[in-house]
Amino acid sequence: MKLGGPLRVIAAMVALHASWPLAAQAHQSISLALGWGVDTARSPERDIVRLWQAYLADRPDSNHPSPHWSASEQAEFPDFDLLRGYVYQGFPAWTVVQLTPAPGADSTYVLRTLVAGTYDSGKAVKPLALFRVYAVRENGRWVLGNAFLRLTRDWPRETLGSVTFVYPPSYHFDRSRARASARFVDSLAAAFGLPAPSGVRYYVTHDVEEMFRVMGLDYFPSGHDTAGGRSSAVDRLVFSGFSKLGEGYRHELAHLVFWPMTRVGHTHWLVSEGLATWTGGAAGLDFDGLLPGLARYVRAHPDVSLESIASDPPPREGTLDVGYDGFAVLCEMVFKKGGVQAVKSLVAAGSSVDEVLGTAARLLGLGRGDLDAAWRRRVLGILTP
């Protein structure tokens, strides 16, 4: 999920057009075991495992400077551990399943780890992730580094405007679509009076499986979804796992544009996702294309409300994400009533549901009790009687 989103493994499974999930809020000790065939009798293998153990013992679920991670990566990426929100979710059983030299790279080792939970007194093991980091030499010592930088090292890339697109050698790069995405970043930033993000890296992949693999996740639960995207606004990174959109995954680019508004931590995660959905679409559809599915859902669920959606978002089904789409409509309503400044007020309303909905009602000139009725009218208004 996006930074600021709910910490639930299932949420990360069903919302693949989201951004990063949050890392665990409280660090739990990690038990690191060595799998069959992982030999640490000699160096550098012994030193690398000790390095990994030291990093895992130093609150890896929270973002803080680490002597165990590449200094150059920490300088480039403010939230330097790309997989922080995915793998550090309180699962206690960690096993190093591979520690081998990386093919085609000097002084570089692949460190692949399985994260799992145990159940029924240890009789059942349920994996959360199989992921990789790399151990590299930097300033005469071993440090850890992200997989995506090594796995895409030889990929073609092209810079258009403020966005550098990186794509597999087998991929047919759509320069026209990429140029339109770069223009979208600039125009959206200008419309909201925000500085356009610079130095954006946009990684194009064919599908979600390849996207996760490039990020370093050889396995991560993705449900039935085969397309989606991820972004890290603070690191100016976008990963597109949807070949239909390729260079045009605007939802994730919108998150980067709105980062100056949402980074202070006073924005409800669904307001952030709704804003990106309203301006950048989601699941391969633009905002208008998402509305019919939402309208059919609202008509079939007469008791649904903004509060119920925010408190317990329904699982995504196909292209329908009631939380994202429903709050996109709310953002649109607020914009039509009060323009950009009203949207900024909604974004700054706070992280609680009561703060968000109370502010939305005020911005729309409604009583709190009338907000849902107005929202339903807007959603259902697109359906033919």
Residue ranges and their predicted role:
Residues 123-155:
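Short beta-strand edge/turn micro-motifs at domain boundaries
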Residues 33-36, 57-102, 211:
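Short solvent-exposed beta->alpha transition segments
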Residues 225-227, 244, 263-385:
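Acidic/His/Gly-enriched intrinsically disordered linker/tail segments
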Residues 9-19:
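Bacterial N-terminal signal peptides
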Residues 24-57:
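Short, low-complexity N-terminal intrinsically disordered segments enriched in polar/charged residues
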Residues 1-10:
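Bacterial N-terminal signal peptides that target proteins for export
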Residues 80-124, 239-242, 250-253:
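Surface-exposed, charged secondary-structure patches
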Residues 155-268, 279, 355-359:
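Juxtacatalytic substrate-recognition/specificity segment
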